[in-house]
Curated annotation (Swiss-Prot):
<feature type="compositionally biased region" description="Low complexity">
    <location>
        <begin position="412"/>
        <end position="443"/>
    </location>
</feature>
<keyword id="KW-0813">Transport</keyword>
<dbReference type="GO" id="GO:0006914">
    <property type="term" value="P:autophagy"/>
</dbReference>
<dbReference type="GO" id="GO:0005737">
    <property type="term" value="C:cytoplasm"/>
</dbReference>
<keyword id="KW-0472">Membrane</keyword>
<feature type="compositionally biased region" description="Acidic residues">
    <location>
        <begin position="167"/>
        <end position="179"/>
    </location>
</feature>
<keyword id="KW-0072">Autophagy</keyword>
<feature type="compositionally biased region" description="Polar residues">
    <location>
        <begin position="444"/>
        <end position="457"/>
    </location>
</feature>
<keyword id="KW-0653">Protein transport</keyword>
<feature type="region of interest" description="Disordered">
    <location>
        <begin position="412"/>
        <end position="457"/>
    </location>
</feature>
<keyword id="KW-0175">Coiled coil</keyword>
<feature type="region of interest" description="Disordered">
    <location>
        <begin position="167"/>
        <end position="188"/>
    </location>
</feature>
<dbReference type="GO" id="GO:0016020">
    <property type="term" value="C:membrane"/>
</dbReference>
<keyword id="KW-0963">Cytoplasm</keyword>
<dbReference type="GO" id="GO:0015031">
    <property type="term" value="P:protein transport"/>
</dbReference>
<protein>
    <recommendedName>
        <fullName>Autophagy-related protein 23</fullName>
    </recommendedName>
</protein>
<comment type="function">
    <text>Required for cytoplasm to vacuole transport (Cvt) vesicle formation and efficient autophagy. Plays a role in ATG protein retrieval from the pre-autophagosomal structure (PAS) and is especially required for autophagy-dependent cycling of ATG9. Also plays a role in regulation of filamentous growth.</text>
</comment>
Length: 491
C-alpha cells in the first residue's frame, strides 16, 4: 500500500510538471505566432507538443483514476492517523501534568502542631527524697566535698587502728575502766546512728526511684531512636518513589514523541528516520499543526476522487478539439501548397480562392471556439485565428498576378517544406492504455527559460515590399505567420 501511494505521489508530481510545461508551451506558441522570423517547423512542433501534453495529462489522469481504491484507503488511514495524534496529544497533556506534579515545588512545609497529646511527662520521684536527704546532712560531710573524702579516709584508718588495738589488747587483763574509756573514745562523736540509718533508707529509696526513672527515659529514648530509623527509611523510600515516577513519566513522554515521529514518517511529513525522543524544530511545528496538514492532504485526495473523472472528459475534449484545429490548419496549408504547386507555371494566382479557403478555416475555428468553454483552449485557437484574419486582410490588398520569378520561389519553397522532417519528443500515445510506462519522458520538461531556440518579439508583418509592389507582384503570406524569407527560398 505504501509503495502504491508513493507511486501515486510520483504520478501527481509528474502531472504537475506536465501542467507547468503546457503553460510554458502556450506562452511560447503565442510568441511564435507574433514573430516573423519563426520557422514553420518550430510552429508545427509547438502545436504538436501542446497536443502531446494534452495526451499525457489525459493518460496520467486515467492512471490516477485506477488508484481510486488506494486513494480511499489512504484517506481512511489519514483519518485514523489524526485520531492517533489526538490520542497522543491527550496522553502527552496527562503525563506532562503528572510529571509537573512530581516535580512540583509548591508543596507546603507541614508544621508540627503543639498539643497536650504530643507532650511526654517525665517522672522525677527521686528528687523530693534527695532534697530531704540533703537537708538532713552537712554538705561538707557529703561526697560533694573533698574534705569529706579526706576525713573519711582518716576516720577509716582510725577505725581500723582501733580495731587492731582492740584485738591486740583483747587478752590483756587491764582495768575495766580503761576499757570503758577506750570504748567511749571510739563512739563518742556528733553523728547520730539513727539519723545515719534513716538516711541510708532514704538513699536506698532514692536510688531505686531514680533507677526506675532512668529505665523510663531509656525506654523513651529507645522508642525515639526506632522512630528516627523508621523516618529515615520512609524518607529514602519516598524519594526513590518520586524519582521512579519522574523517570516513568518522562519515559512515557519520550515514547509518545517516538510514536509521533513514526506517524510523521508514515505520511511523508518527516524525512528524519532517526527515531529519537527529541523532536527538531520543523517536527514540532508540524505536530502543533498536524490536523491542518493531514486535513489538507485528505482534501487534496478527495479532490482527486471527485475531479478526475470530470477531468478525463475535459482533457479528452482538449485533445479532440486541438486535433481538429491542427487538422484544419494542416488542411489549409496543404490546399495552398497544392494550389500553388499546380499553378507554379502560370503567370497569375487567384487570391480570392486563397482568401476563401482561409475564411473557411477561420469559420471552422470559430465553430470550435464556440463548442468549448475551456479558456486555455479558446485562447490557443483565438491566437491562431487572429493570424489567419490578418493574413486575409493583407491578401485582399494584393489581388495582382504574381510574376514568374516569385512564383518559382513559392514552388521551390513548397517543395522544400514537403521534404522537411519535423522531429518531436516522444510522448504518451493517445489510447486508453493507462500503463505507468506511458509517463512523459523527462526530456520533455525543458527549461522554461529556453524550451526552444530564442524567438523575437516583433509584431506580425504580412505586407508588400517596395520592390515587389513596383513590379506589380503579389506579396506571399506565410501561413501561420512565418516570414516570407523562411517560406520562400530562392535558389
Amino acid at each position: 500500500m505504501k509503495n502504491q501511494i508513493n507511486k501515486l505521489d510520483d504520478i501527481l508530481l509528474q502531472q504537475q510538471h506536465t501542467n507547468d510545461y503546457l503553460l510554458e508551451l502556450v506562452k511560447f506558441h503565442n510568441n511564435l505566432l507574433h514573430d516573423n522570423l519563426t520557422s514553420i517547423e518550430n510552429l508545427n512542433l509547438t502545436r504538436k507538443k501542446i497536443l502531446d501534453c494534452f495526451n499525457d495529462l489525459f493518460n496520467l489522469n486515467s492512471i490516477i483514476i485506477n488508484y481510486h481504491g488506494d486513494i480511499k484507503l489512504e484517506i481512511k488511514n489519514l483519518k485514523e492517523i489524526i485520531i492517533k495524534f489526538n490520542k497522543l496529544n491527550k496522553l502527552e497533556i496527562f503525563y506532562q501534568n503528572k510529571l509537573n506534579q512530581w516535580k512540583s515545588s509548591k508543596v507546603k512545609q507541614i508544621q508540627s502542631a503543639s498539643s497536650t497529646n504530643n507532650k511526654i511527662t517525665i517522672n522525677c520521684n527521686y528528687q523530693p527524697l534527695l532534697k530531704t536527704y540533703l537537708n538532713q546532712i552537712d554538705p561538707d560531710e557529703s561526697t560533694l566535698s573533698n574534705q569529706f573524702n579526706s576525713n573519711l579516709s582518716i576516720n577509716d584508718e582510725k577505725l581500723i587502728y582501733t580495731n587492731e588495738s582492740f584485738t591486740e589488747d583483747e587478752d590483756d587483763t587491764g582495768d575495766e575502766d580503761n576499757d570503758i574509756d577506750h570504748s567511749n573514745n571510739h563512739t563518742n562523736n556528733d553523728e547520730d546512728p539513727f539519723l545515719i540509718l534513716s538516711n541510708i533508707k532514704l538513699l536506698e529509696n532514692c536510688q531505686s526511684t531514680i533507677k526506675a526513672d532512668i529505665n523510663q527515659l531509656e525506654f523513651l529514648l529507645s522508642n525515639y531512636k526506632k522512630d528516627l530509623k523508621f523516618i529515615e527509611n520512609e524518607l529514602n523510600s519516598q524519594n526513590l518513589k518520586t524519582k521512579y515516577n519522574i523517570t516513568l513519566m518522562q519515559e512515557k513522554l519520550d515514547k509518545i514523541n517516538i510514536k509521533r515521529k513514526k506517524l510523521l514518517i508514515k505520511i511523508g511529513l518527516s524525512k528524519n528516520k532517526n527515531l529519537t525522543s527529541v523532536l527538531d524544530k520543523d517536527e514540532k511545528i508540524i505536530i502543533e499543526n498536524i490536523n491542518d496538514f493531514i486535513n489538507s492532504k485528505i482534501n487534496s485526495l478527495n479532490d482527486q476522487l471527485s475531479n478526475k473523472k470530470e477531468n478525463s472528459i475535459v482533457l479528452n475534449q482538449k485533445i479532440n478539439l486541438w486535433e481538429q484545429v491542427i487538422n484544419q490548419l494542416n488542411d489549409l496549408e496543404n490546399s495552398l501548397k497544392i494550389y500553388l504547386s499546380k499553378n507554379k507555371k502560370k503567370k497569375s494566382i487567384d487570391y480570392n480562392i486563397m482568401i476563401e479557403w482561409i475564411n473557411d478555416t477561420i469559420n471552422n475555428l470559430n465553430d470550435i471556439i464556440d463548442s468549448t468553454d475551456i479558456q486555455l483552449l479558446r485562447n490557443l485557437i483565438e491566437n491562431e485565428k487572429k493570424v489567419l484574419v490578418q493574413a486575409t486582410n493583407e491578401l485582399k490588398l494584393n489581388l495582382t498576378p504574381v510574376n514568374s520569378k516569385i512564383n518559382d520561389s513559392i514552388s521551390k519553397s513548397i517543395n522544400n517544406n514537403n521534404n522537411t522532417n519535423i522531429t518531436t519528443n516522444t510522448s504518451i500515445n493517445n489510447n486508453n492504455n493507462t500503463n505507468e510506462n506511458s509517463l512523459l519522458d523527462s526530456s520533455q520538461f525543458q527549461s522554461s527559460k529556453n524550451p526552444f531556440p530564442n524567438i523575437g518579439t516583433s509584431p506580425p508583418k504580412i505586407s508588400i515590399s517596395e520592390h515587389i509592389a513596383s513590379n506589380n507582384s503579389f506579396t506571399t503570406f506565410q501561413l501561420n505567420n512565418t516570414s516570407n524569407d523562411k517560406l520562400m527560398k530562392n535558389e
